[in-house]
Structures are given as C-alpha cells and as structure tokens.
Design a protein with these regions (language model features):
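Catalytic zinc-binding patch centered on the HExxH motif and its immediate surroundings
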Residues: 29-60
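Short pre-active-site segment immediately N-terminal to the catalytic Zn-binding motif
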Residues: 63-77
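Catalytic Zn2+-binding segment of zinc metalloproteases
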Residues: 74, 83-99, 132
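Post-HEXXH active-site segment of zinc metalloproteases
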Residues: 90-117
Length: 173
C-alpha cells in the first residue's frame, strides 16, 4: 500500500532536483517563506527536516511536510535557518568547494559544517527576533535539546551545543 506513495515521492523528488522549473511549479507545492524571497517547497517524505540547495543556479529551500505538520513553529525556525544558509553564503561555498571534488566531498567541508550550522541558527534567531517570534525561538531551542549530546546531523554540533547557541543568540539580539 505504501509503495505507490514512495514511488510518487521519489518521482517528485527527482523532478525537484533534475526537472524543469515548470514541472516544479505544476507538481511540487510551495509554502510562503516570510524570512527570505527564496522559493520554498514543501515535500512529503523528505528524509531531512529541511535543506537549502541550488536548482539551475536558483536558490531553493525544501522543507519536510511532516515536520511542518508536527510543529509549525519549528517549521518556521527551519525556514529561517535555511534562508540563513543562503544569505550567509553557505550554499555558494558548498557548491564552489565541492564542484571539483570526487566521491567523498563531505570529507573536505566537514570542519566547516559545525560552524555553518551554528551561524545559521544564530542568524535565524536574529530574523525571528525581527519578526517578533520569541515562541518560535524557544520551540527550536527545545527541539535541539531533544538531541541531547548527540550530533544533530553528520558533522553537526550536538543538540546541547545548538540549544545553548540559540539561547546566546536570543539574548544577544
């Protein structure tokens, strides 16, 4: 029963990363992103909570529909966080640094990933403060605490580190 859903999600996902802009407009739902003017897609069955990338040299953000449904406040933090990766130049650095590398590209940028995540979190907090969304900041801090001492992703800071960083940035701005 679940196989047709997975096949459809795979086709949609492939269309997002390989298809034309028109195909995306017709098939993939978008969501209003109040934190930046970057097209933000809502994708079911996305293995990540959210991600930032480029599509035909255009910045895009993809957010998990499941994550948004579970917590719209945390989803808003993720949108601000992913906007930050674009505005801080992280996506461009990633593309520039990995464009010429072989089969293990993460090896080359792993040292930068921790710093990029903390910077994106802090910039997201700044944007959320500007939009007067303190509850969104607190929800994000609480979500990070759920990771505890475990990394929140490959080569990422731990949940405790990210929660402390979010609190520091909230006090700063």
């Amino acid at each position: 029963m679940r196989l047709p859903v997975l096949i459809i999600a795979a086709i949609l996902g492939l269309g997002l990363f390989c298809g034309s802009a028109l195909a995306k407009q017709l098939w993939l739902p978008t969501i209003d992103n109040p934190y930046c003017a970057i097209t933000t897609y809502l994708l079911p069955d996305l293995p990540e909570q959210a991600l930032s990338t480029m599509d035909n040299d255009h910045p895009i953000i993809v957010v998990s529909a499941m994550t948004m449904a579970q917590s719209s406040a945390y989803g808003r933090f993720l949108m601000a966080h992913e906007c930050s990766h674009h505005t801080l130049g992280h996506v461009a650095v990633y593309k520039r640094e990995l464009g010429h590398l072989g089969p293990q590209p993460f090896f080359y940028i792993a040292p930068q990933l921790r710093h990029m995540e903390l910077d994106a979190d802090c910039n997201a907090v700044r944007m959320l403060k500007i939009k007067n969304e303190p509850e969104t900041i607190e929800v994000a801090r609480q979500m990070m605490l759920q990771f505890g001492g475990k990394p929140t992703g490959a080569y990422y800071p731990t949940g405790i580190e990210r929660a402390a960083n979010i609190a520091r940035c909230a006090a700063k701005y």
